[in-house]
C-alpha cells in the first residue's frame, strides 16, 4: 500500500492529487489547487512551498510524482514554471519523500491512451479510473493523472520484477535438473 501525491506545477495554479494504491486498486484521497494571486514571483513560490508542505502534512504520502518541464515558446514562462516545480520538489525532499518525474505526454498516454489527449479527456478518464462522482477541476485532474501514472509505473515494475524472478527461478530449476541427470549418469568428471 502506498499513498502517492501527484503535482501539476504552475506559477499561478499548482494542482495536486492524492491517491492510495493497494495492489491494482486505486483510491481517491483528495485533490485541489494551490492558487497564487498576482503577487511577485518570490511570494508566489513561498505560497506554493507552504501549500505543498500543508498537503504533505495532511495526507502523509509515501511518494511524490511531478510533471517534467516541457520546452515552452516563451522563455520567461518556462523559467517561472521551472521555479514553481523546483519549489514543490524542495517541499517534498524536505519531508524525505522520493521524487518521481513524468513527461506530460507519458501521463496522457498512460491515463487516456493517447499522448496528445486534451484536458477534458484527461478529466474524463481520471473520473472513470478513480470512480469519482464529479469531474475534478483541470489542474487537479492533471495532478491525479500524474499520481495514477506513478501508480501504474509501480505496478508495471512489480509485474516485470515478478516475471524476471520467475524466469530466473525456472532457469535455475532447469539447470539443477540437468546437473542431477548428468551427475547420476556419471558424465561429470572433476579435474585437479
From Swiss-Prot:
Keywords: Cytoplasm, DNA damage, DNA recombination, DNA repair, DNA-binding, Endonuclease, Hydrolase, Magnesium, Metal-binding, Nuclease. Its cofactor is Mg(2+). GO terms for biological process: DNA recombination; DNA repair. Mg(2+) 2 binds at residue 67. It comes from the Bacteria. It catalyses: Endonucleolytic cleavage at a junction such as a reciprocal single-stranded crossover between two homologous DNA duplexes (Holliday junction). It is found in: Cytoplasm. Binds 2 Mg(2+) ion per subunit. The active site is at 8, 67, 139. InterPro entries: RNaseH-like_sf, RNaseH_sf, X-over_junc_endoDNase_Mg_BS, X-over_junc_endoDNase_RuvC. Homodimer which binds Holliday junction (HJ) DNA. The HJ becomes 2-fold symmetrical on binding to RuvC with unstacked arms; it has a different conformation from HJ DNA in complex with RuvA. In the full resolvosome a probable DNA-RuvA(4)-RuvB(12)-RuvC(2) complex forms which resolves the HJ. PANTHER family: CROSSOVER JUNCTION ENDODEOXYRIBONUCLEASE RUVC. Belongs to the RuvC family. The RuvA-RuvB-RuvC complex processes Holliday junction (HJ) DNA during genetic recombination and DNA repair. Endonuclease that resolves HJ intermediates. Cleaves cruciform DNA by making single-stranded nicks across the HJ at symmetrical positions within the homologous arms, yielding a 5'-phosphate and a 3'-hydroxyl group; requires a central core of homology in the junction. The consensus cleavage sequence is 5'-(A/T)TT(C/G)-3'. Cleavage occurs on the 3'-side of the TT dinucleotide at the point of strand exchange. This is Crossover junction endodeoxyribonuclease RuvC. It comes from Glaesserella parasuis serovar 5 (strain SH0165). The gene is ruvC.
